[in-house]
């Protein structure tokens, strides 16, 4: 998924008045968390600015960007949530992967994005590629994503042949 496609999905969620999905997608994409880690985005985490993630027997801290905290804070007030998970069903249960996947797929036509590209995990990939393109620090990215191996993180940062070709053309090492 490209940044432009992500932006169109956000616009579609907003136009359909699906505030929960609009914020959920931004939460995943601006923090790099896994869908299964959304339950750790709590009212308390938003107040602190840090989510404590316990996953796969490991703990890590995820920092919530200031603008995200503001948006989530408004949403929490509107939803009258006092504590616990921010993203819940109408019954108050944490959202699961299938709810999120289904909601995202419903945006595809409006957003003009292929439904083959729209998966919650692709938001995590977009975060990773964007972070890496700015920072070029795969070790720090591995820490942020909660990977124990940098080799796992490299999968997220691999670029397409088109990008490689463009970079090679710019090297300027040929004299004609």
Segments predicted by a language model, with ranges:
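C-terminal catalytic core of tyrosine-transesterase DNA break-rejoin enzymes
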Residues: 26, 30, 124-148, 155
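Catalytic-site neighborhood detector that most strongly recognizes the C-terminal catalytic loop/helix
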Residues: 56, 145, 150-170
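DNA breakage-rejoining catalytic core of tyrosine-based enzymes
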Residues: 1-7, 57-67, 81-83
């Amino acid at each position: 998924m490209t940044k432009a496609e992500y932006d169109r999905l956000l616009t579609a969620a907003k136009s359909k008045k699906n505030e929960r999905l609009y914020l959920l997608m931004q939460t995943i994409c601006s923090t790099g968390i896994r869908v299964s880690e959304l339950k750790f985005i709590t009212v308390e985490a938003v107040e602190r600015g840090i989510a404590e993630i316990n996953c796969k027997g490991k703990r890590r801290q995820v920092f919530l960007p200031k603008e995200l905290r503001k948006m989530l804070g408004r949403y929490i007030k509107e939803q009258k949530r006092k504590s616990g998970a921010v993203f819940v069903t109408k019954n108050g249960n944490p959202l699961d992967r299938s709810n999120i996947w289904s909601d995202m797929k419903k945006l595809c036509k409006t957003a003009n994005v292929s439904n083959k590209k729209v998966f919650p995990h692709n938001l995590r990939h977009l975060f990773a590629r964007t972070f890496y393109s700015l920072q070029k620090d795969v070790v720090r990215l591995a820490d942020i994503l909660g990977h124990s191996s940098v080799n796992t993180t490299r999968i997220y940062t691999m670029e397409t042949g088109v990008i490689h070709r463009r970079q090679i053309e710019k090297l300027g090492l040929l004299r004609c």
